[in-house]
Swiss-Prot record:
Gene this chain is encoded by: NUDCD1
Misc. remarks from the entry: Isoform 1 is the dominant immunogenic isoform and is capable of eliciting a humoral response in individuals with a variety of solid tumors. Expression of isoform 1 in a wide variety of malignancies as well as the presence of an immunogenic epitope suggest that it may be a suitable target for antigen-specific immunotherapy.
Protein name: NudC domain-containing protein 1
GO biological process, one term: immune system process
Organism: Homo sapiens (Human)
Modified residues annotated as Phosphoserine in this record: S8, S388
Protein backbone atom coordinates (compact mmCIF):
# COMPACT_ATOMS: atom_id res chain seq x y z
CA UNK A 1 0.00 0.00 0.00
CA UNK A 2 1.43 3.36 -1.06
CA UNK A 3 1.75 6.00 1.63
CA UNK A 4 1.12 9.68 0.81
CA UNK A 5 4.25 11.83 0.77
CA UNK A 6 4.48 14.08 3.82
CA UNK A 7 5.43 17.49 2.42
CA UNK A 8 6.00 21.01 3.70
CA UNK A 9 5.56 24.50 2.28
CA UNK A 10 8.85 26.24 1.49
CA UNK A 11 8.85 29.92 2.37
CA UNK A 12 10.96 32.21 0.15
CA UNK A 13 12.96 34.33 2.59
CA UNK A 14 13.52 37.21 0.11
CA UNK A 15 9.72 37.75 0.08
CA UNK A 16 9.64 38.37 3.85
CA UNK A 17 10.30 41.77 5.43
CA UNK A 18 11.51 41.44 9.04
CA UNK A 19 11.81 45.25 9.30
CA UNK A 20 8.18 45.93 8.38
CA UNK A 21 6.90 48.70 10.65
CA UNK A 22 3.15 48.42 10.16
CA UNK A 23 0.44 50.14 8.15
CA UNK A 24 -0.03 53.90 8.25
CA UNK A 25 -3.63 55.08 8.09
CA UNK A 26 -4.12 57.20 4.98
CA UNK A 27 -6.94 59.74 4.76
CA UNK A 28 -6.71 60.01 0.97
CA UNK A 29 -10.26 59.73 -0.41
CA UNK A 30 -11.20 56.62 -2.38
CA UNK A 31 -13.47 57.22 -5.39
CA UNK A 32 -16.65 55.20 -4.81
CA UNK A 33 -19.43 54.64 -7.35
CA UNK A 34 -22.88 53.20 -6.62
CA UNK A 35 -25.23 51.35 -8.98
CA UNK A 36 -28.83 50.58 -8.07
CA UNK A 37 -29.97 47.10 -9.13
CA UNK A 38 -33.17 46.54 -11.12
CA UNK A 39 -34.01 43.47 -9.02
CA UNK A 40 -32.67 42.29 -5.68
CA UNK A 41 -29.92 39.70 -5.39
CA UNK A 42 -31.26 36.13 -5.10
CA UNK A 43 -30.15 35.65 -1.50
CA UNK A 44 -31.16 32.38 0.18
CA UNK A 45 -31.15 32.55 3.97
CA UNK A 46 -30.37 29.53 6.13
CA UNK A 47 -33.38 27.42 7.10
CA UNK A 48 -34.10 26.20 10.63
CA UNK A 49 -32.71 22.75 9.77
CA UNK A 50 -29.41 24.27 8.54
CA UNK A 51 -28.09 25.03 12.00
CA UNK A 52 -24.52 23.68 12.04
CA UNK A 53 -21.27 25.59 11.71
CA UNK A 54 -20.65 23.81 8.39
CA UNK A 55 -23.94 25.15 7.00
CA UNK A 56 -22.83 28.64 8.01
CA UNK A 57 -19.40 28.23 6.38
CA UNK A 58 -20.79 26.84 3.13
CA UNK A 59 -24.05 28.73 2.63
CA UNK A 60 -24.39 31.43 5.31
CA UNK A 61 -21.13 33.14 4.28
CA UNK A 62 -21.60 32.55 0.55
CA UNK A 63 -20.13 35.16 -1.81
CA UNK A 64 -22.97 36.14 -4.19
CA UNK A 65 -20.66 38.19 -6.44
CA UNK A 66 -18.63 36.25 -9.01
CA UNK A 67 -15.54 37.56 -10.79
CA UNK A 68 -14.76 36.44 -14.35
CA UNK A 69 -10.99 36.11 -14.07
CA UNK A 70 -10.67 35.58 -17.84
CA UNK A 71 -11.79 39.17 -18.48
CA UNK A 72 -10.59 42.20 -16.53
CA UNK A 73 -13.10 43.97 -14.26
CA UNK A 74 -16.09 41.79 -15.17
CA UNK A 75 -18.41 40.62 -12.37
CA UNK A 76 -21.67 38.65 -12.28
CA UNK A 77 -24.55 38.08 -9.85
CA UNK A 78 -27.92 36.30 -10.00
CA UNK A 79 -31.10 38.20 -9.13
CA UNK A 80 -34.51 37.14 -7.85
CA UNK A 81 -35.88 36.97 -11.41
CA UNK A 82 -33.43 34.16 -12.22
CA UNK A 83 -31.31 36.43 -14.42
CA UNK A 84 -27.52 36.27 -14.57
CA UNK A 85 -26.47 39.91 -14.60
CA UNK A 86 -23.07 41.16 -15.74
CA UNK A 87 -21.23 44.42 -15.17
CA UNK A 88 -18.04 45.02 -17.13
CA UNK A 89 -16.22 48.26 -16.33
CA UNK A 90 -14.40 50.15 -19.05
CA UNK A 91 -14.54 53.64 -17.57
CA UNK A 92 -15.54 54.47 -13.99
CA UNK A 93 -17.14 57.76 -14.92
CA UNK A 94 -19.35 56.13 -17.57
CA UNK A 95 -20.80 53.12 -15.80
CA UNK A 96 -23.70 51.39 -17.49
CA UNK A 97 -26.44 49.33 -15.88
CA UNK A 98 -25.77 45.60 -15.29
CA UNK A 99 -26.94 43.65 -18.36
CA UNK A 100 -28.74 40.32 -18.54
CA UNK A 101 -26.67 37.60 -20.22
CA UNK A 102 -28.76 34.53 -19.35
CA UNK A 103 -32.01 33.60 -17.63
CA UNK A 104 -32.52 30.37 -15.70
CA UNK A 105 -35.32 28.31 -17.28
CA UNK A 106 -36.67 27.15 -13.88
CA UNK A 107 -38.52 29.07 -11.19
CA UNK A 108 -36.09 29.45 -8.29
CA UNK A 109 -38.79 29.88 -5.65
CA UNK A 110 -40.59 26.62 -6.53
CA UNK A 111 -38.08 24.45 -4.61
CA UNK A 112 -38.49 24.52 -0.82
CA UNK A 113 -35.02 23.19 0.07
CA UNK A 114 -33.05 25.13 -2.53
CA UNK A 115 -29.61 26.63 -1.96
CA UNK A 116 -28.17 29.80 -3.46
CA UNK A 117 -27.58 29.67 -7.22
CA UNK A 118 -23.87 29.46 -8.07
CA UNK A 119 -21.70 30.02 -11.12
CA UNK A 120 -18.09 29.27 -12.07
CA UNK A 121 -16.12 30.32 -15.15
CA UNK A 122 -14.43 27.18 -16.48
CA UNK A 123 -12.67 28.91 -19.38
CA UNK A 124 -12.93 32.01 -21.56
CA UNK A 125 -15.88 30.41 -23.41
CA UNK A 126 -17.42 27.94 -20.93
CA UNK A 127 -19.42 28.36 -17.71
CA UNK A 128 -20.87 25.92 -15.16
CA UNK A 129 -24.08 26.97 -13.41
CA UNK A 130 -26.26 25.61 -10.61
CA UNK A 131 -29.77 26.92 -9.95
CA UNK A 132 -29.60 25.74 -6.32
CA UNK A 133 -32.25 23.02 -6.75
CA UNK A 134 -29.88 20.19 -7.72
CA UNK A 135 -29.67 20.88 -11.46
CA UNK A 136 -26.33 21.45 -13.20
CA UNK A 137 -25.97 23.48 -16.40
CA UNK A 138 -22.94 23.58 -18.68
CA UNK A 139 -23.13 26.67 -20.87
CA UNK A 140 -21.15 27.65 -23.92
CA UNK A 141 -20.85 31.44 -23.91
CA UNK A 142 -18.72 32.28 -26.90
CA UNK A 143 -16.15 35.00 -26.26
CA UNK A 144 -17.58 36.87 -23.30
CA UNK A 145 -17.40 40.63 -23.54
CA UNK A 146 -17.50 40.54 -27.34
CA UNK A 147 -21.07 41.41 -28.35
CA UNK A 148 -20.55 39.92 -31.80
CA UNK A 149 -19.63 36.43 -30.56
CA UNK A 150 -21.09 36.23 -27.03
CA UNK A 151 -24.12 33.96 -26.85
CA UNK A 152 -25.00 31.90 -23.75
CA UNK A 153 -26.31 28.49 -24.85
CA UNK A 154 -27.11 25.44 -22.67
CA UNK A 155 -24.98 22.46 -23.77
CA UNK A 156 -25.75 20.19 -20.80
CA UNK A 157 -28.64 20.26 -18.34
CA UNK A 158 -29.29 17.48 -15.84
CA UNK A 159 -30.69 16.87 -12.36
CA UNK A 160 -27.92 15.51 -10.10
CA UNK A 161 -29.77 14.78 -6.87
CA UNK A 162 -29.82 16.96 -3.76
CA UNK A 163 -29.15 20.73 -4.07
CA UNK A 164 -25.48 21.77 -4.27
CA UNK A 165 -23.22 24.73 -4.91
CA UNK A 166 -20.37 24.78 -7.43
CA UNK A 167 -16.92 25.14 -5.88
CA UNK A 168 -14.65 24.91 -8.94
CA UNK A 169 -14.63 23.83 -12.58
CA UNK A 170 -12.19 23.52 -15.49
CA UNK A 171 -12.43 22.98 -19.25
CA UNK A 172 -10.30 20.25 -20.88
CA UNK A 173 -9.87 20.17 -24.65
CA UNK A 174 -7.85 17.71 -26.72
CA UNK A 175 -7.97 16.27 -30.23
CA UNK A 176 -10.54 13.62 -29.34
CA UNK A 177 -12.95 15.22 -26.89
CA UNK A 178 -13.97 18.23 -24.85
CA UNK A 179 -14.64 17.81 -21.12
CA UNK A 180 -15.84 19.94 -18.23
CA UNK A 181 -14.81 18.83 -14.73
CA UNK A 182 -16.55 20.41 -11.76
CA UNK A 183 -16.71 20.13 -7.95
CA UNK A 184 -20.12 20.19 -6.27
CA UNK A 185 -20.57 20.75 -2.53
CA UNK A 186 -23.45 19.38 -0.44
CA UNK A 187 -24.15 19.04 3.27
CA UNK A 188 -26.29 15.97 3.80
CA UNK A 189 -28.07 14.40 6.75
CA UNK A 190 -26.47 11.36 8.35
CA UNK A 191 -29.06 9.29 10.19
CA UNK A 192 -26.50 7.01 11.88
CA UNK A 193 -24.52 9.89 13.43
CA UNK A 194 -25.65 9.79 17.06
CA UNK A 195 -22.86 11.79 18.71
CA UNK A 196 -21.94 14.37 16.04
CA UNK A 197 -23.89 17.12 14.29
CA UNK A 198 -25.99 14.63 12.31
CA UNK A 199 -24.61 15.93 8.98
CA UNK A 200 -21.69 15.13 6.70
CA UNK A 201 -20.02 17.10 3.91
CA UNK A 202 -20.13 15.65 0.40
CA UNK A 203 -17.83 16.88 -2.38
CA UNK A 204 -18.71 15.40 -5.78
CA UNK A 205 -16.24 15.45 -8.68
CA UNK A 206 -18.26 15.28 -11.91
CA UNK A 207 -16.78 15.05 -15.42
CA UNK A 208 -19.01 15.84 -18.44
CA UNK A 209 -17.66 15.07 -21.92
CA UNK A 210 -18.42 14.93 -25.65
CA UNK A 211 -16.40 13.23 -28.39
CA UNK A 212 -15.36 15.65 -31.12
CA UNK A 213 -16.03 13.33 -34.08
CA UNK A 214 -19.56 12.47 -32.93
CA UNK A 215 -22.62 14.68 -33.00
CA UNK A 216 -23.68 13.32 -29.62
CA UNK A 217 -24.63 15.49 -26.68
CA UNK A 218 -22.52 16.12 -23.61
CA UNK A 219 -22.90 13.37 -21.02
CA UNK A 220 -21.53 12.46 -17.60
CA UNK A 221 -18.62 10.02 -17.90
CA UNK A 222 -17.36 10.06 -14.30
CA UNK A 223 -18.76 10.76 -10.82
CA UNK A 224 -16.63 10.42 -7.69
CA UNK A 225 -17.62 11.46 -4.17
CA UNK A 226 -15.53 12.53 -1.19
CA UNK A 227 -17.00 12.64 2.29
CA UNK A 228 -15.87 14.37 5.44
CA UNK A 229 -17.00 16.24 8.52
CA UNK A 230 -15.92 19.78 7.61
CA UNK A 231 -16.51 22.09 4.65
CA UNK A 232 -13.21 22.46 2.76
CA UNK A 233 -11.59 25.89 2.96
CA UNK A 234 -10.21 25.35 -0.55
CA UNK A 235 -10.88 22.74 -3.24
CA UNK A 236 -9.69 22.87 -6.85
CA UNK A 237 -9.15 20.52 -9.79
CA UNK A 238 -5.71 20.56 -11.43
CA UNK A 239 -5.56 22.19 -14.90
CA UNK A 240 -4.93 18.83 -16.62
CA UNK A 241 -7.76 17.16 -14.69
CA UNK A 242 -5.44 14.53 -13.22
CA UNK A 243 -5.74 15.52 -9.58
CA UNK A 244 -7.50 17.45 -6.88
CA UNK A 245 -6.19 19.65 -4.06
CA UNK A 246 -8.11 20.30 -0.84
CA UNK A 247 -7.45 22.39 2.27
CA UNK A 248 -9.72 21.33 5.13
CA UNK A 249 -9.89 21.14 8.91
CA UNK A 250 -11.02 17.50 8.90
CA UNK A 251 -9.90 15.13 6.16
CA UNK A 252 -12.11 14.06 3.25
CA UNK A 253 -11.93 10.61 1.66
CA UNK A 254 -13.37 9.05 -1.49
CA UNK A 255 -16.31 6.76 -0.75
CA UNK A 256 -17.64 5.87 -4.18
CA UNK A 257 -15.37 5.22 -7.08
CA UNK A 258 -15.44 2.26 -9.46
CA UNK A 259 -12.89 -0.33 -8.39
CA UNK A 260 -12.49 1.12 -4.90
CA UNK A 261 -16.20 0.99 -4.04
CA UNK A 262 -16.06 -2.45 -2.41
CA UNK A 263 -12.97 -1.51 -0.39
CA UNK A 264 -14.61 1.70 0.82
CA UNK A 265 -17.79 -0.17 1.76
CA UNK A 266 -15.68 -2.49 3.93
CA UNK A 267 -14.10 0.58 5.55
CA UNK A 268 -17.54 2.08 6.19
CA UNK A 269 -18.74 -1.17 7.78
CA UNK A 270 -15.68 -1.33 10.03
CA UNK A 271 -16.30 2.28 11.06
CA UNK A 272 -19.88 1.43 12.00
CA UNK A 273 -18.67 -1.55 14.04
CA UNK A 274 -16.42 0.78 16.02
CA UNK A 275 -19.46 2.79 17.10
CA UNK A 276 -20.52 1.55 20.57
CA UNK A 277 -23.59 -0.70 20.55
CA UNK A 278 -24.41 0.42 24.08
CA UNK A 279 -23.07 2.67 26.85
CA UNK A 280 -22.70 1.64 30.49
CA UNK A 281 -21.63 3.20 33.76
CA UNK A 282 -21.32 1.98 37.31
CA UNK A 283 -21.37 3.05 40.96
CA UNK A 284 -20.38 1.13 44.08
CA UNK A 285 -23.83 -0.52 44.15
CA UNK A 286 -25.19 -0.83 40.63
CA UNK A 287 -24.66 -0.58 36.86
CA UNK A 288 -26.68 1.36 34.28
CA UNK A 289 -26.78 0.25 30.62
CA UNK A 290 -28.16 2.64 27.96
CA UNK A 291 -29.18 1.42 24.49
CA UNK A 292 -30.42 3.61 21.61
CA UNK A 293 -33.66 2.09 20.32
CA UNK A 294 -34.88 2.04 16.70
CA UNK A 295 -37.68 4.52 15.99
CA UNK A 296 -41.26 3.50 16.91
CA UNK A 297 -40.06 0.86 19.39
CA UNK A 298 -42.58 -0.33 21.98
CA UNK A 299 -42.37 -2.41 25.16
CA UNK A 300 -43.61 -5.43 23.21
CA UNK A 301 -40.48 -5.25 21.00
CA UNK A 302 -38.15 -5.67 24.00
CA UNK A 303 -37.37 -8.95 25.77
CA UNK A 304 -34.80 -8.99 28.59
CA UNK A 305 -33.87 -12.00 30.72
CA UNK A 306 -31.92 -11.47 33.96
CA UNK A 307 -30.03 -14.39 35.55
CA UNK A 308 -27.59 -14.21 38.51
CA UNK A 309 -24.53 -14.16 36.22
CA UNK A 310 -26.06 -13.90 32.74
CA UNK A 311 -28.05 -11.41 30.60
CA UNK A 312 -30.00 -11.80 27.35
CA UNK A 313 -31.45 -8.80 25.42
CA UNK A 314 -33.67 -9.23 22.33
CA UNK A 315 -34.92 -6.23 20.29
CA UNK A 316 -37.63 -6.78 17.66
CA UNK A 317 -36.89 -10.55 17.54
CA UNK A 318 -33.16 -9.90 16.95
CA UNK A 319 -30.45 -10.91 19.41
CA UNK A 320 -28.91 -7.65 20.67
CA UNK A 321 -26.67 -8.72 23.56
CA UNK A 322 -26.21 -12.08 25.27
CA UNK A 323 -23.49 -13.47 27.51
CA UNK A 324 -22.00 -14.07 30.91
CA UNK A 325 -21.72 -11.02 33.17
CA UNK A 326 -18.38 -10.08 34.73
CA UNK A 327 -19.78 -10.70 38.22
CA UNK A 328 -23.03 -11.70 39.89
CA UNK A 329 -26.11 -9.46 40.08
CA UNK A 330 -29.30 -9.45 42.11
CA UNK A 331 -31.43 -10.54 39.15
CA UNK A 332 -34.74 -10.11 40.99
CA UNK A 333 -34.05 -6.41 41.77
CA UNK A 334 -32.70 -5.52 38.30
CA UNK A 335 -35.11 -3.49 36.11
CA UNK A 336 -35.44 -1.77 32.73
CA UNK A 337 -37.39 1.24 31.40
CA UNK A 338 -37.92 3.10 28.09
CA UNK A 339 -36.85 6.75 28.41
CA UNK A 340 -38.43 9.72 26.60
CA UNK A 341 -35.26 10.11 24.50
CA UNK A 342 -36.12 6.82 22.72
CA UNK A 343 -33.51 4.89 24.67
CA UNK A 344 -33.62 1.76 26.81
CA UNK A 345 -32.16 2.07 30.32
CA UNK A 346 -31.28 -1.12 32.23
CA UNK A 347 -30.39 -1.07 35.96
CA UNK A 348 -28.33 -4.00 37.29
CA UNK A 349 -27.83 -4.35 41.07
CA UNK A 350 -24.37 -5.67 42.04
CA UNK A 351 -24.19 -8.69 44.38
CA UNK A 352 -20.64 -7.74 45.43
CA UNK A 353 -20.91 -4.08 46.40
CA UNK A 354 -17.76 -2.00 45.87
CA UNK A 355 -16.37 -4.29 43.16
CA UNK A 356 -15.33 -2.35 40.02
CA UNK A 357 -16.29 -4.12 36.79
CA UNK A 358 -13.76 -3.68 33.93
CA UNK A 359 -16.35 -4.99 31.43
CA UNK A 360 -20.08 -5.68 31.40
CA UNK A 361 -20.24 -8.96 29.46
CA UNK A 362 -17.09 -11.08 29.46
CA UNK A 363 -15.33 -10.82 26.08
CA UNK A 364 -17.80 -8.29 24.63
CA UNK A 365 -16.14 -5.20 23.09
CA UNK A 366 -19.26 -3.53 21.64
CA UNK A 367 -20.01 -1.31 24.63
CA UNK A 368 -18.37 1.84 25.95
CA UNK A 369 -17.79 2.51 29.65
CA UNK A 370 -18.59 6.07 30.74
CA UNK A 371 -16.73 7.14 33.87
CA UNK A 372 -17.89 10.04 36.00
CA UNK A 373 -15.49 12.68 37.34
CA UNK A 374 -15.53 11.27 40.90
CA UNK A 375 -14.44 7.85 39.66
CA UNK A 376 -11.65 9.37 37.54
CA UNK A 377 -10.37 11.38 40.52
CA UNK A 378 -10.39 8.30 42.75
CA UNK A 379 -8.50 6.23 40.18
CA UNK A 380 -5.96 9.02 39.64
CA UNK A 381 -5.36 9.27 43.39
CA UNK A 382 -4.77 5.52 43.63
CA UNK A 383 -2.28 5.64 40.74
CA UNK A 384 -0.39 8.75 41.86
CA UNK A 385 2.38 6.75 43.59
CA UNK A 386 3.14 5.04 40.27
CA UNK A 387 3.72 8.27 38.38
CA UNK A 388 5.50 10.51 40.91
CA UNK A 389 6.94 10.27 44.37
CA UNK A 390 6.32 13.98 44.96
CA UNK A 391 2.98 15.72 45.08
CA UNK A 392 4.33 18.56 42.90
CA UNK A 393 7.46 17.45 41.02
CA UNK A 394 7.47 20.62 38.86
CA UNK A 395 6.71 23.67 41.03
CA UNK A 396 7.41 26.07 38.14
CA UNK A 397 4.65 24.56 36.05
CA UNK A 398 2.10 27.00 37.43
CA UNK A 399 4.29 29.97 36.46
CA UNK A 400 3.81 30.56 32.73
CA UNK A 401 6.73 32.11 30.78
CA UNK A 402 4.52 35.08 29.91
CA UNK A 403 1.46 36.78 31.29
CA UNK A 404 -1.50 35.37 29.37
CA UNK A 405 -3.50 38.51 30.16
CA UNK A 406 -1.05 40.55 28.11
CA UNK A 407 -1.71 38.42 25.02
CA UNK A 408 -4.20 39.70 22.50
CA UNK A 409 -6.80 37.40 21.00
CA UNK A 410 -5.00 37.33 17.66
CA UNK A 411 -1.78 36.07 19.34
CA UNK A 412 -3.36 32.84 20.52
CA UNK A 413 -2.84 29.82 18.27
CA UNK A 414 -5.86 28.08 16.83
CA UNK A 415 -6.64 24.70 18.32
CA UNK A 416 -7.74 23.32 14.99
CA UNK A 417 -5.04 22.12 12.62
CA UNK A 418 -5.89 22.03 8.92
CA UNK A 419 -4.20 19.94 6.26
CA UNK A 420 -3.53 20.34 2.54
CA UNK A 421 -4.03 17.14 0.54
CA UNK A 422 -3.49 16.25 -3.10
CA UNK A 423 -5.57 13.36 -4.53
CA UNK A 424 -4.74 11.43 -7.70
CA UNK A 425 -7.63 11.53 -10.17
CA UNK A 426 -7.16 7.94 -11.36
CA UNK A 427 -6.41 5.99 -8.17
CA UNK A 428 -8.40 8.41 -5.94
CA UNK A 429 -5.66 7.99 -3.33
CA UNK A 430 -3.92 10.75 -1.37
CA UNK A 431 -0.46 11.35 -2.89
CA UNK A 432 0.75 14.42 -0.94
CA UNK A 433 -0.14 15.75 2.52
CA UNK A 434 0.93 19.00 4.17
CA UNK A 435 0.09 19.52 7.84
CA UNK A 436 -0.67 23.24 8.04
CA UNK A 437 -0.51 23.29 11.84
CA UNK A 438 -1.40 26.76 13.05
CA UNK A 439 -1.11 28.30 9.56
CA UNK A 440 -4.67 29.60 9.43
CA UNK A 441 -6.38 29.61 6.02
CA UNK A 442 -7.40 33.16 5.04
CA UNK A 443 -8.72 33.28 1.44
CA UNK A 444 -8.17 32.15 -2.16
CA UNK A 445 -7.62 34.19 -5.31
CA UNK A 446 -7.16 33.48 -9.02
CA UNK A 447 -3.90 35.09 -10.14
CA UNK A 448 -3.71 33.31 -13.51
CA UNK A 449 -6.98 31.75 -14.77
CA UNK A 450 -5.00 29.03 -16.59
CA UNK A 451 -3.52 27.91 -13.26
CA UNK A 452 -5.18 26.65 -10.08
CA UNK A 453 -6.46 29.29 -7.63
CA UNK A 454 -3.90 30.50 -5.10
CA UNK A 455 -4.56 30.22 -1.37
CA UNK A 456 -3.40 32.54 1.37
CA UNK A 457 -2.25 31.26 4.77
CA UNK A 458 -1.23 33.00 7.95
CA UNK A 459 2.45 32.41 8.81
CA UNK A 460 3.27 33.97 12.18
CA UNK A 461 2.08 37.58 11.72
CA UNK A 462 2.26 37.65 7.91
CA UNK A 463 -0.13 36.39 5.24
CA UNK A 464 1.62 34.33 2.54
CA UNK A 465 0.17 33.60 -0.90
CA UNK A 466 0.79 30.14 -2.39
CA UNK A 467 0.43 29.11 -6.06
CA UNK A 468 -0.14 25.36 -6.64
CA UNK A 469 1.83 23.79 -9.53
CA UNK A 470 0.51 20.29 -10.18
CA UNK A 471 3.20 19.59 -12.79
CA UNK A 472 6.05 19.99 -10.25
CA UNK A 473 5.88 16.84 -8.14
CA UNK A 474 8.80 17.87 -5.91
CA UNK A 475 7.73 21.48 -5.38
CA UNK A 476 3.96 21.66 -5.81
CA UNK A 477 3.31 24.88 -3.91
CA UNK A 478 5.21 28.09 -4.64
CA UNK A 479 5.35 31.07 -2.29
CA UNK A 480 4.63 33.97 -4.68
CA UNK A 481 3.75 36.96 -2.46
CA UNK A 482 3.63 38.22 1.12
CA UNK A 483 1.22 40.63 2.77
CA UNK A 484 3.22 41.93 5.71
CA UNK A 485 1.60 41.64 9.16
CA UNK A 486 -1.78 40.97 7.54
CA UNK A 487 -2.22 37.70 9.42
CA UNK A 488 -2.02 39.64 12.67
CA UNK A 489 -4.11 42.60 11.48
CA UNK A 490 -7.02 40.54 10.12
CA UNK A 491 -7.29 38.58 13.36
CA UNK A 492 -8.38 41.73 15.17
CA UNK A 493 -11.27 42.29 12.71
CA UNK A 494 -13.92 40.28 14.51
CA UNK A 495 -16.77 41.27 12.15
CA UNK A 496 -14.95 40.41 8.91
CA UNK A 497 -16.99 38.58 6.29
CA UNK A 498 -14.99 38.44 3.04
CA UNK A 499 -11.26 38.61 2.31
CA UNK A 500 -9.60 39.18 -1.07
CA UNK A 501 -6.51 40.54 -2.80
CA UNK A 502 -5.62 41.95 -6.20
CA UNK A 503 -4.34 39.37 -8.72
CA UNK A 504 -1.14 41.44 -9.00
CA UNK A 505 -0.77 41.43 -5.15
CA UNK A 506 -0.76 45.25 -5.02
CA UNK A 507 -3.24 45.28 -2.14
CA UNK A 508 -5.37 43.07 0.09
CA UNK A 509 -8.85 43.98 1.29
CA UNK A 510 -11.45 42.72 3.71
CA UNK A 511 -14.99 43.80 4.41
CA UNK A 512 -17.17 43.55 7.48
CA UNK A 513 -20.73 42.25 7.48
CA UNK A 514 -22.00 45.81 7.26
CA UNK A 515 -20.70 48.89 5.48
CA UNK A 516 -16.93 49.05 6.18
CA UNK A 517 -14.13 47.98 3.80
CA UNK A 518 -10.44 47.91 4.81
CA UNK A 519 -7.67 48.14 2.21
CA UNK A 520 -4.03 47.25 2.96
CA UNK A 521 -1.53 48.31 0.31
CA UNK A 522 1.93 46.90 -0.32
CA UNK A 523 4.83 49.17 0.76
CA UNK A 524 5.42 51.92 -1.82
CA UNK A 525 8.25 54.49 -2.21
CA UNK A 526 7.69 57.84 -0.49
CA UNK A 527 7.35 61.02 -2.53
CA UNK A 528 8.76 63.03 0.40
CA UNK A 529 11.57 62.46 2.90
CA UNK A 530 10.53 60.63 6.08
CA UNK A 531 12.78 59.75 9.04
CA UNK A 532 12.45 57.11 11.74
CA UNK A 533 13.44 59.09 14.85
CA UNK A 534 14.05 56.04 17.03
CA UNK A 535 16.59 54.54 14.66
CA UNK A 536 17.75 57.78 13.06
CA UNK A 537 17.33 56.53 9.52
CA UNK A 538 15.41 57.57 6.45
CA UNK A 539 12.30 55.55 5.63
CA UNK A 540 12.18 54.59 1.98
CA UNK A 541 8.78 52.88 1.82
CA UNK A 542 5.44 53.11 3.61
CA UNK A 543 2.52 50.66 3.58
CA UNK A 544 -0.84 52.42 3.69
CA UNK A 545 -4.14 51.36 5.17
CA UNK A 546 -7.37 52.92 3.90
CA UNK A 547 -10.94 52.57 5.10
CA UNK A 548 -14.06 53.00 2.97
CA UNK A 549 -17.54 53.30 4.47
CA UNK A 550 -20.41 52.46 2.11
CA UNK A 551 -23.59 54.51 2.16
CA UNK A 552 -25.95 51.62 2.87
CA UNK A 553 -27.58 49.82 5.77
CA UNK A 554 -27.93 46.55 3.86
CA UNK A 555 -25.56 43.66 4.70
CA UNK A 556 -22.73 42.93 2.28
CA UNK A 557 -23.49 39.83 0.17
CA UNK A 558 -20.56 39.79 -2.26
CA UNK A 559 -16.98 41.02 -2.50
CA UNK A 560 -14.42 40.83 -5.34
CA UNK A 561 -11.06 42.48 -5.99
CA UNK A 562 -9.36 43.23 -9.31
CA UNK A 563 -6.07 45.05 -9.92
CA UNK A 564 -7.77 48.45 -10.07
CA UNK A 565 -11.14 48.09 -8.32
CA UNK A 566 -13.08 46.58 -5.46
CA UNK A 567 -16.65 45.41 -6.16
CA UNK A 568 -19.04 45.22 -3.19
CA UNK A 569 -22.55 43.76 -3.56
CA UNK A 570 -25.53 44.35 -1.27
CA UNK A 571 -29.15 43.29 -1.74
CA UNK A 572 -30.07 46.36 -3.80
CA UNK A 573 -26.77 47.98 -4.84
CA UNK A 574 -23.41 47.31 -6.42
CA UNK A 575 -20.53 49.53 -5.23
CA UNK A 576 -17.26 50.14 -7.07
CA UNK A 577 -14.25 51.42 -5.15
CA UNK A 578 -11.38 52.68 -7.28
CA UNK A 579 -8.25 51.44 -5.49
CA UNK A 580 -5.48 51.86 -8.07
CA UNK A 581 -5.38 54.48 -10.80
CA UNK A 582 -2.38 53.03 -12.63
CA UNK A 583 -3.18 50.75 -15.52
Amino acid sequence: MEVAANCSLRVKRPLLDPRFEGYKLSLEPLPCYQLELDAAVAEVKLRDDQYTLEHMHAFGMYNYLHCDSWYQDSVYYIDTLGRIMNLTVMLDTALGKPREVFRLPTDLTACDNRLCASIHFSSSTWVTLSDGTGRLYVIGTGERGNSASEKWEIMFNEELGDPFIIIHSISLLNAEEHSIATLLLRIEKEELDMKGSGFYVSLEWVTISKKNQDNKKYEIIKRDILRGKSVPHYAAIEPDGNGLMIVSYKSLTFVQAGQDLEENMDEDISEKIKEPLYYWQQTEDDLTVTIRLPEDSTKEDIQIQFLPDHINIVLKDHQFLEGKLYSSIDHESSTWIIKESNSLEISLIKKNEGLTWPELVIGDKQGELIRDSAQCAAIAERLMHLTSEELNPNPDKEKPPCNAQELEECDIFFEESSSLCRFDGNTLKTTHVVNLGSNQYLFSVIVDPKEMPCFCLRHDVDALLWQPHSSKQDDMWEHIATFNALGYVQASKRDKKFFACAPNYSYAALCECLRRVFIYRQPAPMSTVLYNRKEGRQVGQVAKQQVASLETNDPILGFQATNERLFVLTTKNLFLIKVNTEN
